Amino acid sequence: MGFVEDETPWCGGHVSARVWCVRANNPSPMTYVGTNSWIVAEPGAKECVVIDPAPAGEQVQRILATCGEAGLRIGAIVATHDHPDHIEGIPELVAATGAPVYAPRTSRIEQLLQKHGFAKCGGVKRACSEGSEDLGAVEAGAAGELDSGGLPHSCEEKAGWGADVQALPKGAFRPFEEASEFEAIALPGHSEDSVGLLLPAEQSLFTGDVLFRHGPTVVFHPDGVLASYFASLDTLERLVREGRVRRFYPGHGYPINDPLPIIEATRKHRVDRLNQVKEALNAGTLAEPDALFDAVYQGVNPALRMPSIRSIRAQLKFLGI
């Protein structure tokens, strides 16, 4: 067995007692059928965790609607990594809910929030209008209404409300009292900050862009490192063989119910690509990404040329070239 060719597109839905998937309508050669945003709540709970809310706009509204239909408030937002197709909806979701954000690397998310009008006020991250002075007001009524952008009247009037961005804790953690227990597991390679979010109650792992059922991911050099990616595949295999994980929830495409064949297919793909690069170099191809793409990546969608170039750079670094 290897990668699985989907007979019908993945559409998301209520996939387990604790987990919903809202699949975004952003298909592309990079995002496949769309980004998976995940909602996680304990049975009977009134609050949930949202993982990877992106893109903004329609997807955020669908996440809010799904939570509303399930009778859930959003108590926390978590990112598996900080690529745009996994974090772009965070400002809009924070504006709508005031939920804290947890991420393995916070700088890009903080920049995104600031771009959308959030700022640090009074030593604590609060939502302020862009261009305002410290606790400047936003155009809204004093009774607590939101403006058209979803921002509160002012930081002062909404003390405690705002963009609270925190680094993911090490080890087991619950974002709030009735939340499911998670454990962040470092899975660098696709990006330096990539993590898997283990849900022990279901022996499931939210893998972001580390592993897909339908095909390989990209190692985004220089942030992504191939040696780290191989180590992350080993980590995934160990988690499965130890019985800690039985199911993967990826950032794109169907859940992975039989992980070991997909892990092995992914590892084989990476090794085969390395061997193809070495063969091309031995045959006289220049050690330049564009030349190697033309020699090795024949048949690849031209829209994937630039991501493939990033992976080729990662391969050359791995080979010490």
Please provide the spans of the model-predicted regions.
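Conserved beta-strand hairpin/beta-sheet module of binuclear metal-dependent hydrolase folds
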Residues: 5, 9-70, 196-208, 213
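Short Gly/Pro-enriched turn/cap motifs at secondary-structure boundaries
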Residues: 10, 28-29, 165, 186-188
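Active-site HxH/HxHxD metal-binding segment of metal-dependent hydrolases
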Residues: 33, 55-180
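Short hydrophobic/aromatic-enriched beta-strand-loop microsegments
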Residues: 98-104, 206-208, 304
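Metallo-beta-lactamase
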Residues: 46-50, 55-57, 118, 122-130, ...
